[in-house]
């Protein structure tokens, strides 16, 4: 390696797996260079979350990052970790700095049949990675009063809309997005569809959200008509817009094989649904692609809290590390492409092949065994599964 990856460490069970993957599958094989940032909740707390901002800025500098799953604290976590503040989602902070789009796709393996039987091809979720509820401002309303939405233009002109006249306690939320970010999102989706030669679907709720969601719809249509329509027609692929509820029904009836572009929250929810329906959330790749050509790879799942508590008690866990391994392989391959190191790309390919072959040979974690058609699966603990992948990798290299 010539340029380091930006390495963002994380929390709980995924943090344990992170080190296992490095020790067993990376360090023995490659000259791994990383610029390390500890995004574990304790360290974010110690640095007042500055470490998250620093890691995102380092990603802008170097171009490729790999991120471990992290805790986004809620009230229970504030008590558990004795936090002075309910720190924002690290992913939300990073995505706000990098902008871009999150593409999530299932890892398909022979022997793991989707719950939706007609899904024979992967569905890629393209999730807008900026704004909306992830960069919101919230107020708990203590009692009666008037809530208003106020925009003050640069020249001092005010636009004012009544949100609600409260006669008691309640809640208010302010969300935003920018045309620039929506345009970047649209172009990323159309470009990805052209690159992968797949149809693109986009869905919002513009019938209810006549300004906010309708702006998303209008920007997508304008960019498609002006910049991508001819290319789509040349490739024989289509762009299709529909309401989010109709899209969900169509997705379930489909055979897969397309990109489904979603707003930030919709993409968060639907990527979990799609991943689980294909088999397991730990079998889902995730990459954030920014308009400036910056890439951040991560697993699409959380920190596996339940397994971590078992691990702390000294109990054995059988945690699927595939998506976290694929975060590393995605980042290493992209680094190899950018730095023209074919050996690094080849290693990433071989490690992914080793993951698939290990599962198809019947060696897997407990969650995979529950959905596998393999008659006599060998259920391995977290470390032994990684060691089994290492054995397969050795046979492929």
Task: Outline where the language-model segments fall.
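N-terminal glycine-rich phosphate/adenylate-binding segment common to multiple enzyme folds
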Residues: 42-158, 171, 265, 269
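Flexible, glycine/charged-enriched surface loops at secondary-structure junctions
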Residues: 30-36, 196-204, 228-241, 336-348, ...
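N-terminal small/polar loop signature for handling phosphorylated ligands or for N-terminal nucleophile
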Residues: 41-55, 217-258
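Glycine-rich phosphate/pyrophosphate-binding loop and the adjoining helix
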Residues: 129-130, 135-186, 193, 338-341, ...
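N-terminal alpha-helical transmembrane segments of multi-pass membrane transport
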Residues: 13, 17-18, 23-47, 56-59
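Glycine-rich phosphate/nucleotide-binding loop
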Residues: 251-350, 357-361
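Glycine-rich phosphate/diphosphate-binding loop of Rossmann-like nucleotide-binding domains
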Residues: 1-20, 149-242
């Amino acid at each position: 390696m010539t340029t380091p990856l930006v390495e963002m460490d994380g929390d709980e069970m995924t943090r344990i797996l992170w080190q296992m993957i490095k020790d067993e599958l990376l360090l023995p094989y490659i000259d791994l260079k990383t610029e390390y940032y500890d995004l574990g909740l304790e360290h974010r707390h110690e640095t007042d979350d500055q470490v998250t901002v620093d890691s995102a800025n380092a990603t802008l500098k170097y171009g490729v990052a790999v991120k471990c799953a992290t805790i986004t604290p809620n009230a229970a976590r504030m008590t558990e970790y004795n936090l002075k503040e309910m720190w924002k989602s690290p992913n939300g902070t990073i995505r706000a700095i990098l902008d871009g789009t999150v593409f999530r796709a299932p890892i398909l393996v022979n022997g793991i049949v989707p719950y939706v039987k007609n899904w024979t091809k992967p569905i890629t979720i393209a999730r807008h990675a900026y704004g909306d509820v992830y960069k919101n401002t919230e107020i708990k309303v203590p009692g009666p009063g008037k809530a208003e939405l106020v925009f003050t233009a640069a020249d001092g002109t005010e636009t004012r809309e009544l949100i609600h006249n409260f006669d008691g306690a309640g809640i208010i939320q302010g969300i935003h997005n920018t045309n620039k970010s929506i345009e970047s999102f649209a172009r990323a989706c159309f470009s990805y569809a052209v690159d992968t030669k797949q149809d693109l679907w986009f869905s919002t709720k513009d019938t209810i959200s006549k300004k906010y969601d309708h702006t998303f719809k209008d920007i997508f249509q304008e960019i498609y008509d002006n910049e991508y329509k001819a290319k789509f027609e040349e490739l024989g692929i289509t762009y299709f817009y529909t309401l989010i509820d109709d899209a969900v029904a169509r997705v379930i009836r489909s055979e897969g094989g397309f990109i489904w572009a979603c707003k930030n929250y919709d993409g968060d929810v639907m990527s979990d649904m799609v991943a689980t329906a294909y088999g397991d959330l730990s079998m889902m790749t995730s990459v954030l692609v920014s308009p400036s050509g910056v890439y951040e790879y991560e697993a699409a799942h959380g920190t596996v809290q339940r397994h971590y508590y078992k691990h702390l008690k000294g109990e054995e866990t059988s945690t699927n590390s595939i998506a976290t391994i694929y975060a590393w392989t995605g980042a290493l391959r992209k680094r190899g492409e950018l730095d023209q190191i074919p050996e690094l790309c080849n290693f990433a390919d071989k490690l992914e092949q080793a993951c698939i072959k290990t599962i198809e040979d019947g060696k897997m974690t407990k969650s995979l065994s529950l959905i596998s058609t393999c008659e006599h699966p060998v259920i391995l603990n977290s470390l032994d599964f990684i060691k089994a992948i290492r054995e397969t990798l050795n046979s492929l290299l």
